[in-house]
Amino acid sequence: MIYLILTSTLTLATTWIVPRNLLWPSSILNSILISVISLNLLNNHSTSLWHNLSLNFATDPTSTPLIILSSWLVPISLIASINTIQNHNHINQRTFISLVFTILTALILTFSSLELSLFYIAFETTLLPTLTLISRWGAQKERYQASIYFLFYTLIGSLPLLVSIIAIFSYENTIILPSIHLTNYITSLPITLTSIWWIFCFIAFIIKMPIYGFHLWLPKAHVEAPIAGSMILAAILLKLGGYGLLRTIPLFYTPSSLLLSPPATAFCIWGALITSIICLRQTDLKALIAYSSVGHMSIVASGIFSLSLWGINGALTLMIAHGLISSALFCLANLLYERNGTRTLSITRGFKMVTPLLTLWWTITCVANLGLPPTPNLIGELLILVAIIDWNTLSAPIITMATVFGAIYSLLILSSTNNSSFPQFLSNIQPTNTSEHTLITFHLIPLVFLILNPSAILIG
């Protein structure tokens, strides 16, 4: 674990040392090295609850897949950004790469931290680099408004989380997660106090995911962010909220959790349905993919709030699968944007006549996004569906409709980008190249691994 943290930190430092002509090759090679090192975490993934232990860091079956996902997608996001960022001067290029590696280091620290204070610091460290990526390298003037939305939503959610951590320390006299699980003093406190803690602790995570009702910052941030920002935001940063819920919900197995989880689950299911309907009315391709992320994260949150092992396993599986697929969708949307200069669905159409191989990638990613077998999305959604129906049979029609509308908008993306007639006023469309196909391929390789071995990310 320490080797992984040190490697990412040293890579961040070397970004400012290497010669200009070696900047991108060395950064990509270093990020690939981090990915290879992270794969070693799978060796003892299922042998014990905590492993790779040090004083403040450890991994377990919950954090290991998310660390590997973070490390895997950073080199892909760098390769996807080369065409855009190479037009800037070398200082801006070094700054951009440094911000990406800062986010990676903060993510590894967040997912491996045993202390709640270190978890909070690393959790909030991702804010500033992401904010800079959006405001500095966004495509349009609206990026400043998107940055303000992102900043204030995150800050509003962060303060209650900090108060919760301080309160936990004052009662438990420790903020180390294994120690809190052992003492379990919170369960003996009054239900009013634990209910307030429950709400304060989880509001930061449901904003970060986000679920419907706390999501207004996400479409703006996605639409205005550069491709690396969109890929990292969709694939990894949204999973911080889900990881926070998975980490802290065992601390609150109290009467308050049994009291507050049912309305939270119902709200998440309803939000998933509403968001799926909103997706059908979008005219911007990136906004549509962003709203689909809100819908998927609402389903993930409903699985976690169900407080069942099936729901938690389904949530973790869907988080990993959605991270890969949403990143691939944003990457494909960027490939079309680089060729026609717009994200409007009425213009971004008919590309199967110009780039037929991209149609294959669109088909695979959209099919995976709607959850057809044998994709991991189906496994996650089925596990959550079973957990929700077991929780309350009356919720079955709502979550089923949300899933059906999710399939409809996934097919809408595929149909509008490929099957319509190609606009006559567009000309000189560049053909795709090998590096672009390689990007999508490396998004799909982990999906094949999960199809062949889904138990790799399931918890006991």
From Swiss-Prot:
Protein purpose: Core subunit of the mitochondrial membrane respiratory chain NADH dehydrogenase (Complex I) that is believed to belong to the minimal assembly required for catalysis. Complex I functions in the transfer of electrons from NADH to the respiratory chain. The immediate electron acceptor for the enzyme is believed to be ubiquinone.
Entry membrane topology: Multi-pass membrane protein
Record organism: Patiria pectinifera
Cell compartment(s), UniProt: Mitochondrion membrane
Assigned protein family: Belongs to the complex I subunit 4 family.
Enzyme class: translocase
Ranges that cross the membrane: 22-42, 65-85, 96-116, 118-138, 148-168, 185-207, 226-246, 258-278, 288-310, 315-337, 357-379, 394-414, 439-459
Domain of life: Eukaryota
Pfam families reported for this sequence: Oxidored_q5_N, Proton_antipo_M
GO cellular component terms given for this protein: mitochondrial membrane
EC number: 7.1.1.2
Keywords: Electron transport, Membrane, Mitochondrion, NAD, Respiratory chain, Translocase, Transmembrane, Transmembrane helix, Transport, Ubiquinone
An annotated GO BP: ATP synthesis coupled electron transport
GO molecular function: NADH dehydrogenase (ubiquinone) activity; ubiquinone binding
Listed name of the protein: NADH-ubiquinone oxidoreductase chain 4
Catalytic activity: a ubiquinone + NADH + 5 H(+)(in) = a ubiquinol + NAD(+) + 4 H(+)(out)
